[in-house]
């Protein structure tokens, strides 16, 4: 599995997920500097936090 890893809306960077991390993850939230994005490989889909705008977990290459 490969997942996007950059903190931008348009993302060309991907990484191969290590063993045990078979979910691609993307979280968006607002800070005083504007919208922030986090993308990576995870073992479990985290819960949506109170400050989060959106949360995406998926299991296809570069789906985040």
Swiss-Prot record:
Protein family per UniProt: Belongs to the three-finger toxin family. Ancestral subfamily.
Keywords, in A-Z order: Acetylcholine receptor inhibiting toxin, Disulfide bond, Ion channel impairing toxin, Neurotoxin, Postsynaptic neurotoxin, Secreted, Toxin
Protein known as: Long neurotoxin MS2
RNA-binding keyword on record: no
BP GO annotations: modulation of receptor activity in another organism
InterPro entries: Snake_3FTx (IPR003571), Snake_toxin-like_sf (IPR045860), Toxin_cobra-type (IPR054131)
Keyword Zinc: no
Organism: Micrurus surinamensis
């Amino acid at each position: 599995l490969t997942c996007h890893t950059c903190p931008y809306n348009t993302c060309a960077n991907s990484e191969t997920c290590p063993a045990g991390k078979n979910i691609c993850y993307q979280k968006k939230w607002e800070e005083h500097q504007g919208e922030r994005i986090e993308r990576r490989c995870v073992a479990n889909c985290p819960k949506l936090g109170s400050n989060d705008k959106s949360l995406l977990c998926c299991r296809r290459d570069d789906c985040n």
